[in-house]
Amino acid sequence: MGNRGMEELIPLVNKLQDAFSSIGQSCHLDLPQIAVVGGQSAGKSSVLENFVGRDFLPRGSGIVTRRPLILQLIFSKTEHAEFLHCKSKKFTDFDEVRQEIEAETDRVTGTNKGISPVPINLRVYSPHVLNLTLIDLPGITKVPVGDQPPDIEYQIKDMILQFISRESSLILAVTPANMDLANSDALKLAKEVDPQGLRTIGVITKLDLMDEGTDARDVLENKLLPLRRGYIGVVNRSQKDIEGKKDIRAALAAERKFFLSHPAYRHMADRMGTPHLQKTLNQQLTNHIRESLPALRSKLQSQLLSLEKEVEEYKNFRPDDPTRKTKALLQMVQQFGVDFEKRIEGSGDQVDTLELSGGARINRIFHERFPFELVKMEFDEKDLRREISYAIKNIHGVRTGLFTPDLAFEAIVKKQVVKLKEPCLKCVDLVIQELINTVRQCTSKLSSYPRLREETERIVTTYIREREGRTKDQILLLIDIEQSYINTNHEDFIGFANAQQRSTQLNKKRAIPNQGEILVIRRGWLTINNISLMKGGSKEYWFVLTAESLSWYKDEEEKEKKYMLPLDNLKIRDVEKGFMSNKHVFAIFNTEQRNVYKDLRQIELACDSQEDVDSWKASFLRAGVYPEKDQAENEDGAQENTFSMDPQLERQVETIRNLVDSYVAIINKSIRDLMPKTIMHLMINNTKAFIHHELLAYLYSSADQSSLMEESADQAQRRDDMLRMYHALKEALNIIGDISTSTVSTPVPPPVDDTWLQSASSHSPTPQRRPVSSIHPPGRPPAVRGPTPGPPLIPVPVGAAASFSAPPIPSRPGPQSVFANSDLFPAPPQIPSRPVRIPPGIPPGVPSRRPPAAPSRPTIIRPAEPSLLD
């Protein structure tokens, strides 16, 4: 096998198998193993018991194996068994092992005859076994019995295919000798997933139960239905032997005697039997693992990379580290601070592309939602003019004023400034809600420690609420400051003279920068929601909003214009969301009760989210399209008061109206600039500093460290299992690395060498005795991988055969053919207890002059032979 590292391959695969089974998943990694497949009562379980040398598997009629049994055989000086689901217990009585298998099977499948794909992991340590990993699968059945579901045949087949379809699995196809090989369910399933026969090993059981005068010689010689890895025959105990408590070791001795004494099998007795099968499976599994090493290493590395992302927060410490709770607390708090800052400040590292972060949402509040709230409180023209006229009249009293009083201007401005408090405080509330949501998102990584997560959220949320009071006080102070002094000397204020010049202007909309250009305020997709089905139903268009009109096009290329709607006399109203609709809708209508589009009094425009609706409303406000007033207006009284003004009073009202509009715009601009700065300084930046510098101290003072770091049972189990798998994968990669660098690669021998069969069938039928090669050096396994090997890979001089014997073999070539063609292999190893009969014409002691045969000599299978794989 190369070196000691190769001998550790099977235990390594066992360790990975245990790690993955304990996690409850296969980690998408196909581990090399041997799956035992066969019909019901074909003798699969008996073969496994013969390997172990103990009776430990359930027996009975019908389906006995109802869950896959992953059997890990490990060579050890002591003999005991362990189950993965109860690691702490060592079973020395194998009757208890059988009872535990039955109990564990019933625990998952119930006491009826149902099956389950969840495997049972059993590890057997014994001085009588070779390292092997096998999977005992339920026997293939046709008819449901008892409480089995009617599709039991397909359930079992699907379960078997789940295990044998993996390219890394060898298939041990068990077929009884008293059954026609062409009808073998095991070989049929094996051919479905392994049509080339590269992974299939045939096992023929019940050779002693064949009808008198028949034998399975053609099958075992790989003539009838050839497999690349050949067939091995075994003889198990009969039911009478089992009931009579016949010892397995006595059964193995009887098996050995059967093959030595049977005339059809004695010439191949050294290649038959349970010990040879066990040795062959050990060799082939080890070689199979060696061939799978590159792909296995690649899969291990890929799995390790995916695991590193999941265990990043606790991969630097082991579960048995006594200081891990302190490390975990520090690491969790630091990670929480980093995550919070990234979500607020933004980061190019690991950007979330599915939803907006907390910082992006706060930015939208500052620059879309808050300006929208400011503009939404836009005063009504008629109400404002009426208030100005009342203020002028009340200031003059009984006197008739000749000049426009500036006190009326100050009174109206102060009244408008007070209205700013509500949208400003609402902005603070929106930001606080986003901050709290961000804290909850960041603490989701602390879910392993429920108490720590709860305390962290409580402490940070309490601090945010404290900062809320400070921030709101500061914002109210800013508004009071604006109200305390009306600075009419501001550089942006139009002044009295300009206000009089503008008194003749009737259009209050935003001035366009250049006469030849149209200011585009917003573009985007909207759905016209209230077009009747007779006219095509709801349709999506590309809308373009300017300072003068709303246009929509077929697509974003803006080539095919569908309609252009002037903004004069338009207003916005909310529309309730439909019961089955996931769209958010608002409507545009004409205040003069005119149709807006074709025969529609209002256009209902639909967006995907409420945020898009708010953003479009803010854009319409910039264009001068305001929301509909909720309260009913006394239009008659307003008209009466407005139109009853004399021309001089009307000019004074218009002048003050322009002054108020100019000064309120200055205040709005100042508030829009100071609000984000105030909130950032007093709330967001202070919260970040608190998390980085004071949160840990608050956590230590609020509760005991041990209680904070108490894990939920599920999270602790998941974390420990994941860490175990992580370290097992790293250890596996290290072992594979050592093997890869220190193993001397040799050409892999052919899976089957049946040249002895070919030579026997292609020459004279005269029975001859074949000489035997020298014995292999102790401790070295034969170089041939297949269970039915041909001649040895190391040629032996003919003269050396004088001390050994060989049984008679039919159709052995005569001496003329030996000397005529010196390229033939020397005779294969045979049983060393038979007397020597030297073929006539061969002088003893004459060695071959040909060089030793290469170990990678290709296998030749005669095309005339029928094949299972055709």
Swiss-Prot record:
E.C. number: 3.6.5.5
One Pfam assignment: Dynamin_N
GO biological process, one term: positive regulation of apoptotic process
Region G3 motif, annotated ranges: 136-139
Composition bias type Pro residues, residue spans: 826-855
Phosphothreonine PTM sites in chain numbering: 755
Effect in UniProt of substituting residue 379 to V: In LCCS5; hypomorphic mutation impacting on endocytosis
Effect of substituting residue 369 to W: In CNM1; reduced association with the centrosome
Residue ranges of domain Dynamin-type G in the record: 28-294
Bias kind Low complexity: ranges: 796-806
Binding residues for GDP: 41, 43-46, 59-60, 206, 208, 211, 236-237, 239
Region (G2 motif): 64-66
Alphabetized UniProt keyword annotations: Acetylation, Cell junction, Cell projection, Charcot-Marie-Tooth disease, Coated pit, Cytoplasm, Cytoplasmic vesicle, Cytoskeleton, Disease variant, Endocytosis, Endosome, GTP-binding, Hydrolase, Membrane, Microtubule, Motor protein, Neurodegeneration, Neuropathy, Nucleotide-binding, Phagocytosis, Phosphoprotein, Synapse, Synaptosome
Region (G1 motif): 38-45
Catalytically driven reaction(s): GTP + H2O = GDP + phosphate + H(+)
Family, as annotated: Belongs to the TRAFAC class dynamin-like GTPase superfamily. Dynamin/Fzo/YdjA family.
Subunit annotation: Oligomerizes into a helical polymer that self-assembles around the vesicle membrane, when associated to the menbrane through lipid binding. Interacts with SHANK1 and SHANK2. Interacts with SNX9. Interacts (via C-terminal proline-rich domain (PRD)) with SNX18 (via SH3 domain); this interaction regulates ATG9A and ATG16L1 trafficking from recycling endosomes to sites of autophagosome formation. Interacts with SNX33 (via SH3 domain). Interacts with MYO1E (via SH3 domain). Interacts with PSTPIP1 (via SH3 domain). Interacts with CTNND2.
Miscellaneous note of the record: Overexpression of CNM- and CMT-related DNM2 mutants in COS7 cells, whatever the mutated domain, led to a reduction in clathrin-mediated receptor endocytosis associated with MAPK ERK-1 and ERK-2 impairment. The membrane trafficking impairment process may represent a common pathophysiological pathway in the autosomal forms of CNM DNM2-CMT neuropathy.
Name of this chain's protein: Dynamin-2
Lineage: Eukaryota, Metazoa, Chordata, Craniata, Vertebrata
Gene name per UniProt: DNM2
